[in-house]
């Protein structure tokens, strides 16, 4: 991480939320800000910080900003990182380097690596007189023969059920439903996430072991000259390191390709690699999700040690899934609704396995699972006033949070509560992909939801996608808007999220008799409290 690497350059770095820095940004050390936007608004733990900056305090700090975003969200792309950068500069701050910009639809990690290197290079130039720079190798590995357990201490849930909803077929992946008992003391709200720490698929781990001529029970001892996410100074199996500590399938960055080209001893392969780090990178690497391992297998003349390989890999990341249940159903158990990604690799090497989805798919009843609750954005929950109408738009497993919303409304009806209308616009490829059809029918009969469905492989009356249904119902949507309804979307950022936004702009244009720009502004204002999107890349 950035903080751990800072120690290599003589800095003792600390990490905290932006809100925690309100009123006391340090002036005696560099301030590095990494942040994103949520529908053009600050993240939950940055709202107070942004409001603080807008009071124009005196901030004579040295700072740098790196923003995270997704280029498909054109109107709000890096809006908050840019705003923070400009506000600090206008209140006395001095930029260490220009703002960095990571694109989740592009070479995000490559962009971050380049920005990080520029940051540390600039800091070194300014502070070489009083910084003790560590230049020794950061990671060394010794092959040993003794054994020791991992001993990781984390919160564990227990798998109560794991069933297939839809088998994998030629047009889509397997879909599964899991029920998980939460770790002791954890609670959740409808619309929250379950954060899961997975392990890598055995098939991919085996490929790495084969590439480096290691057996699964080979034990290593890792020593590091700086902070590291690896377990250090005691023996651990190579299998455990590869399965539980590093990302094996993340696309290789341009910089990493250049590193491999430098250790490639076949001239033809070296030329090809340098080309891949150039103009063809996005098409041949990013779009095909080619990993470091894929490159090592495709270009065998690359000479890389196991330690060098591990140094190229980021820490295994926690994945989060929308919870598809309500605590009114069971406050100690959550359900997940997932796609299981297992397809031929676009790189041409083996299969591409979704790390977390395959981990979850292979769990058995009574298995323990490393997990915890993570709160969703404050706006992505059912209204506290149950009488407020809600309109939900989803495709595929994007129905997950809305199953929880509807389950909650059904439970409230049983308790005699007055509830507003709930309308679900749901898109699937075929009728066989229609998830929770029986439950939705039951909930519709008791008045908890009205379901509008559409099937992209069975176009009817010109309607193919969710946005087609929404546009057809635009007069009803307008009435629901006038009645104070809240609108929610969950699904693919590139497909559903962007399309629904475009559709709503058109509806507002017609409803308010205004132009596209004015309609877009109205929708932006709605995003503050009435129009919420939870999308995945």
Which stretches of residues belong to each language-model region?
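FNR-like FAD-binding dehydrogenase module
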Residues: 1-537
């Amino acid at each position: 991480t950035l903080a751990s690497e800072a120690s290599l350059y003589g800095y003792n770095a600390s990490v905290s939320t932006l809100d925690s820095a309100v009123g006391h940004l340090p002036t005696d050390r560099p301030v590095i800000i990494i942040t994103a936007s949520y529908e053009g608004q600050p993240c939950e733990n940055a709202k107070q910080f942004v409001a603080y900056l807008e009071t124009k305090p005196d901030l004579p700090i040295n700072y740098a900003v790196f923003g995270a975003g997704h280029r498909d969200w054109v109107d709000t792309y890096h809006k908050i990182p840019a705003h923070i950068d400009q506000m600090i500069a206008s209140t006395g701050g001095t930029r260490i380097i220009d703002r960095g910009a990571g694109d989740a639809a592009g070479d995000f990690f490559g962009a971050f690596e380049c920005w990080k290197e520029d940051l540390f290079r600039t800091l070194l130039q300014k502070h070489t007189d009083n910084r003790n720079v560590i230049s020794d190798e950061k990671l060394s590995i010794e092959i040993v023969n003794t054994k020791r357990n991992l001993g990781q201490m984390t919160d564990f849930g227990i798998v109560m059920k794991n069933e297939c909803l839809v088998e994998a077929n030629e047009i889509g992946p397997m879909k599964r439903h899991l029920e998980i008992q939460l770790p002791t003391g954890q609670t959740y709200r409808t619309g929250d996430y379950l954060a899961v720490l997975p392990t890598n698929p055995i098939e991919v781990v085996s490929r790495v072991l084969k590439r480096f001529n290691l057996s699964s029970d080979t034990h290593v001892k890792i020593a590091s000259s700086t902070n590291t996410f690896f377990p250090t100074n005691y023996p651990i199996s190579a299998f455990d390191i590869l399965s539980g500590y590093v990302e094996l399938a993340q696309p290789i960055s341009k910089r990493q390709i250049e590193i491999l080209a430098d250790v490639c001893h076949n001239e033809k392969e070296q030329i090809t690699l340098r080309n891949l780090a150039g103009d063809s990178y996005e098409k041949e690497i990013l779009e095909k999700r080619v990993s470091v391992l894929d490159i090592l297998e495709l270009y065998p003349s690359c000479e890389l040690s196991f330690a060098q390989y591990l140094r190229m890999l980021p820490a295994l990341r926690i994945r989060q899934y929308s919870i598809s249940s309500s605590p009114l159903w069971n406050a100690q158990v959550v359900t997940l609704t997932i796609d299981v990604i297992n397809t031929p690799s676009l790189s041409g090497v083996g299969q591409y396995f979704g790390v977390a989805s395959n981990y979850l798919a292979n769990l058995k009843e009574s298995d323990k699972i490393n997990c915890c609750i993570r709160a969703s954005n404050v706006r992505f929950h059912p209204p506290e006033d149950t009488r407020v109408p809600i309109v939900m738009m989803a495709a595929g497993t994007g129905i997950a949070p809305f199953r929880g919303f509807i389950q909650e409304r059904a439970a409230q009806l049983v308790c005699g509560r007055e509830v507003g209308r709930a309308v679900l616009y749901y898109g699937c490829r075929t009728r066989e992909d229609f998830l929770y059809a029986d439950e939705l029918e039951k909930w519709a009969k008791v008045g908890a939801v009205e379901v509008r469905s559409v099937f992209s492989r069975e176009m009817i009356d010109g309607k193919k996608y969710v946005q087609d249904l929404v546009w057809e119902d635009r007069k009803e949507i307008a009435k629901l808007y006038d009645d104070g309804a809240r609108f929610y979307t969950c699904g693919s950022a590139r497909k559903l999220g962007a399309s629904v936004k475009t559709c709503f702009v058109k509806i507002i244009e017609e409803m308010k008799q205004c132009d596209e720009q004015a309609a877009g502004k109205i929708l932006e204002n709605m995003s503050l409290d009435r129009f919420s999107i939870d999308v995945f890349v």
